UniProtKB/Swiss-Prot annotation:
Keywords: Cytoplasm, Methyltransferase, RNA-binding, rRNA processing, S-adenosyl-L-methionine, Transferase. The gene is rsmA. PANTHER family: DIMETHYLADENOSINE TRANSFERASE, DIMETHYLADENOSINE TRANSFERASE-RELATED. It is found in: Cytoplasm. Its main location: cytoplasm. Its EC number is 2.1.1.182. It comes from Streptococcus thermophilus (strain ATCC BAA-250 / LMG 18311). It catalyses: adenosine(1518)/adenosine(1519) in 16S rRNA + 4 S-adenosyl-L-methionine = N(6)-dimethyladenosine(1518)/N(6)-dimethyladenosine(1519) in 16S rRNA + 4 S-adenosyl-L-homocysteine + 4 H(+). GO terms for cellular component: cytosol. This is Ribosomal RNA small subunit methyltransferase A. Pfam families: RrnaAD (PF00398). It comes from the Bacteria. HAMAP family: 16SrRNA_methyltr_A. Belongs to the class I-like SAM-binding methyltransferase superfamily. rRNA adenine N(6)-methyltransferase family. RsmA subfamily. Specifically dimethylates two adjacent adenosines (A1518 and A1519) in the loop of a conserved hairpin near the 3'-end of 16S rRNA in the 30S particle. May play a critical role in biogenesis of 30S subunits.
Length: 290
């Protein structure tokens, strides 16, 4: 019997008198086939260390521990720590850390792996309400995570993996794809969770690029420009950029010059620009002194 078997999950929750907290976005997976598919998608083996976020009662952790060298699981809800100690007692390669991963000193934590030189993968069923902040925090950290295999709201997975000229494409697509290649692995129905969420889920596989997708002179400015360009989706690039940078004649002249130098029409919308277009645009705007 597995932790994820519905009867086992139910028994564990009852034994420990656990009640779900909405504020933590807790939905526990009760489908062993999906858990095995997650591990297979992530290609977990004994030459890989894993960081898991939000292990819950250990359903995914159990599968990871059987396949990985070590698992470091960050759980923000202190009520789940004794439950995890109970459900994972047979796995001595799991370290449960009662900490908010957004506040954790990850640089120090990853040195606590017995074999810290092994590749580190992030495999997680992320709380939906905080998926994007956690993902960007991990991607932008200086830790060379080789891969992320993450369950998230399908709508967010669509946005991350979206191509230009689609409704889902936006600054989040650019922010992630700048660092990672993305692949939608498979969909997960809401019926396989306890309690069932109000949305459908998907597993997204993200692999770190050896080099960022495009070369830019100032990364922070590049991301600032891409965010500004999607400020109001229905507005033109020109309108969004003037809303962000200002509407003085001096600013407008600089914008005009930058757009001309980047060979980008002011009348198009942000969603029509590729990531390389945004790289050209941000460099031109920076050069213009904006």
């Amino acid at each position: 019997m597995r932790i994820a078997d519905y009867s086992v999950t139910k028994a564990v929750l009852e034994r420990h008198g656990f009640t779900f907290k909405k504020s933590f976005g807790q939905n526990f997976l009760t489908d062993t086939n999906i858990l095995q598919k997650i591990v297979d998608t992530a290609e977990i083996n004994k030459n890989v260390n894993v960081i898991e976020i939000g292990p819950g009662i250990g359903a995914l952790t159990e599968f990871l521990a059987e396949n990985a060298s070590e698992v470091m699981a960050f759980e923000i809800d202190e009520r789940l720590v004794p439950i995890l100690e109970d459900t994972l007692r047979d796995h001595d390669n799991v370290k449960v850390i009662n900490e908010d991963v957004l506040k954790a000193d990850l640089q120090t934590r990853v040195k606590e792996f017995e074999n810290p030189d092994l590749p580190i993968k992030v495999v997680a069923n992320l709380p939906y309400y905080i998926t994007t902040p956690i993902l960007m925090h991990l991607i932008e950290s200086k830790i060379p995570f080789s891969e992320f295999v993450v369950m998230m709201q399908k709508e967010v997975a669509d946005r991350i993996s979206a191509e230009p000229n689609t409704k889902a494409y936006g600054s989040l697509s650019i922010a992630v794809q700048y660092y990672m290649t993305t692949k939608m692995a498979f969909a997960v129905p809401r019926t396989v969770f306890v309690p069932a969420p109000n949305v459908d889920s998907a597993i997204l596989k993200m692999t770190r690029r050896k080099q960022p997708l495009v070369e830019v002179k100032d990364e922070d400015f590049f991301f600032r420009v891409s965010k500004a360009s999607f400020l109001h989706r229905r507005k033109t690039l020109w309108n969004n950029l003037t809303s962000h940078f200002g509407k003085s004649e001096e600013v407008k002249n600089k914008l005009d010059q930058a757009l001309e130098n980047a060979a980008i029409k002011p009348s198009i919308r942000g969603e029509a620009l590729s990531i390389s277009d945004f790289a050209r645009l941000s460099d031109a705007l920076r050069e213009a002194g904006l």
